[in-house]
Amino acid sequence: VQTFTGRCLCGQSHFTVNVEMLDVYACHCTLCQKWSGGIAMYLEASGHPLMSPESIEPSHFPSSTRGERFFCSGCGCPLWFTLTDSDRYFIPWTLLELNEVDRRRLILAAEIYTETQPAFWRLTGQYARLSGKEVEEMDYPCHLAH
């Protein structure tokens, strides 16, 4: 497990997170599209984000029956979403302060909810491409009911 520091766009929300692998999950579900403005790319983390004492309290809302989304109260930047029945949460990898070595270790592990992926964007590479049904049938990262 590695611990990383993360910050929102305005810098008022800063935190540390524990990440086991630098596997990125690209989610195409309609909720993530609305939340991110396009394709959402997350790392899976465990435990709970530890907010810095001088950080502002993040805002949050239940986005489905199984998950909650958190965002910076200052700038509105998406921070992470949690699964209500799990100790897992998903954080945009772009929020983390990664050094050059860690940035090179990032891999695209899977594209999920591919049935709602717009035709005008395509990622390339060798990795899993799963529909929402496939994701929900298995205990796969980002298996939030959308």
Please report, for each region that a protein language model flagged, where it lies by residue.
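A short Gly-Trp-Pro
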Residues: 1-7, 12-146
